Amino acid sequence: MKDEVALLATVTLVGVLLQAYFSLQVISARRAFHVSPPLTSGPPEFERVFRAQVNCSEYFPLFLATLWVAGIFFHEGAAALCGLFYLFARLRYFQGYARSAQLRLTPLYASARALWLLVAMAALGLLVHFLPGTLRTALFRWLQMLLPMA
């Protein structure tokens, strides 16, 4: 069992560490711009760091759910690779947003594409899982004819 989910677990841990990094950046920005908790407003430089962290945190549960469902029901390696791309895009998003609101857009779109790809892999994996055995076998035969190298 452990070998079957090791890549997913690794990407999950990387994601958790990235979330911790984002939180530490907010703490650092609070100190730099003298914004004490529970305040969430201050200079624009602080607010951008704060919003970037909150936005990344809001999407993290969606990312984790789709990563694991795609990895278990579609393909672990493909889901893990897509997950790493998503996390890298979120890091670039955070860094860009901290500098200016405009610089967040390109990595935001990249992370959205990665998340939608995980959703598609998860949905396709579940669809195939719930197909009756004869339909599933026919689908796999058709795919093997279509992709003989697979």
Swiss-Prot record:
InterPro entries: 5_LipOase_AP, FLAP/GST2/LTC4S_CS, MAPEG, MAPEG-like_dom_sf, Membr-assoc_MAPEG
Catalytic residues identified in the record: R31 (proton donor), R104 (proton acceptor)
Record note on quaternary structure: Homotrimer. Interacts with ALOX5AP and ALOX5.
Top-level taxonomic group: Eukaryota
Catalytic reaction equation(s): leukotriene C4 = leukotriene A4 + glutathione; (13S,14S)-epoxy-(4Z,7Z,9E,11E,16Z,19Z)-docosahexaenoate + glutathione = (13R)-S-glutathionyl-(14S)-hydroxy-(4Z,7Z,9E,11E,16Z,19Z)-docosahexaenoate
Source species: Mus musculus
Residue positions, PTM Phosphoserine: S36
Protein name as it appears in the record: Leukotriene C4 synthase
Any one GO molecular function term: lipid binding
